[in-house]
Amino acid sequence: MKHKILQYAKDMTAGRLARGFDHCNRVYHTAKQLEDEYDDELLYAATYLHDIILAEPHQLQSAEKAEAVLHEVGFTPGKIELVKEAILSHIPEGEPSFKEAMMLHDADILDSLGMVGITRLAVGAFFWKGAKSLSGVLDLINEYKDRAKSRLLLPRSRKLAEEKIEFMERALKQLEKELALPESDEG
């Protein structure tokens, strides 16, 4: 069952930079660090299938596609509904209502922090938000970073975020410094 889910996730996310298979894999392995006891089958399916569709609203599209995939691999209807709910609530503004959904939610946010986060958000700033300059990218990354910690739900998530946010603040301060060059005189 896991093999089929993994292969499907690889096939659906191949060639993507910010929301590709590597992201899903990091989210799964990060999520496992956030709680000691959880339903691994549920967490596995939700994390590997949460970004399989990019069309917005991607959480809705991914949840619908996940339902078909999980039905095909033999998940029970009740577990399919839980996976869908986790996927639907994984976005930063989401309000997950059970442990595995909170784990996915927080791990997804954590993957947008630190150096990986800076890289993912820079890609996203251009492709999803239409940033036209490095200054625009910097603004979007700072905005996300500033909101991220308050959206984390689990104690271990907040602890993991601290080091990542500290790194981001140093790196973004350096980027801001490098971008703050005066325009050359035309004289």
Question: Where does each model-flagged region fall?
Answer:
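Extreme N-terminal tail/first-helix region
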Residues: 1-15
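An amphipathic alpha-helix signature
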Residues: 2, 6, 28, 63-67, ...
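Onset of an N-terminal alpha helix
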Residues: 2-6, 21-24, 42
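Divalent metal-dependent phosphate-bond-processing catalytic cores, especially two-metal-ion Mg2+/Mn2+ enzymes
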Residues: 11-38, 49, 94-187
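Short glycine/serine- and small hydrophobic-enriched flexible loop segments
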Residues: 32-33, 67-71
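His-Asp-centered metal-binding catalytic motifs of divalent-metal-dependent phosphohydrolases/nucleases
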Residues: 40-58, 62, 66, 82-92
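Basic, amphipathic juxtamembrane/active-site segments
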Residues: 65, 69, 123-124
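Short helix-capping segments at alpha-helix termini
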Residues: 72-79
